Swiss-Prot record:
Tissue: Detected in the superior olivary complex of the auditory hindbrain.
Organism: Mus musculus (Mouse)
InterPro entries according to UniProt: Beta/Gamma-Crystallin, Beta/gamma_crystallin, G_crystallin-like
Family: Belongs to the beta/gamma-crystallin family.
Ranges where the record places region Connecting peptide: 84-87
Protein role: Crystallins are the dominant structural components of the vertebrate eye lens.
Protein's recorded name: Gamma-crystallin E
Residue ranges constituting the Beta/gamma crystallin 'Greek key' domain according to the UniProt record: 2-40, 41-83, 88-128, 129-171
Domain notes: Has a two-domain beta-structure, folded into four very similar Greek key motifs.
Primary gene name: Cryge
GO biological process terms on file: eye development; lens development in camera-type eye
Additional facts recorded: There are six different gamma crystallins identified in mouse lens.
Amino acid sequence: MGKITFYEDRGFQGRHYECSTDHSNLQPYFSRCNSVRVDSGCWMLYEQPNFAGCQYFLRRGDYPDYQQWMGFSDSVRSCRLIPHSSSHRIKIYEREDYRGQMVEITDDCSHLQDRFHFSDFHSFHVMEGYWVLYEMPNYRGRQYLLRPGEYRRYHDWGAMNARVGSLRRIMDFY
């Protein structure tokens, strides 16, 4: 079980709300979010209700202001607790609908283009585990949660384009 606390003001000040499960709409509990404390679990925060908009991956720790989680604003409107997974396996494809070159990955990759020699990745099949996909190399840029399942095109994971720079397993739990 996870635990996360959202604070309206920086430095863990102001009105706060404790959460231990997925929430599709946090708007009734606070109007803005400027700091977060993750006591346990790994979480994905979303700028919009219903798990939409920019996504931010947080693990156990203190985040005294939204820049600490690479946020663009103080808007956090939904959150998802990421379940524990002991094994990780993902297939990545060069083209939509699982076409083109395919590579299977079981570990983190800080620079997908250097490792696999193609720059865009249009589809994914997550066989096992939960992953964070980053728009840029070295785990930077926009973040996307990939849960077990099929992602036939970049819109399926919430991206605006097929630019993918790095991929990391979610392993740090409780």
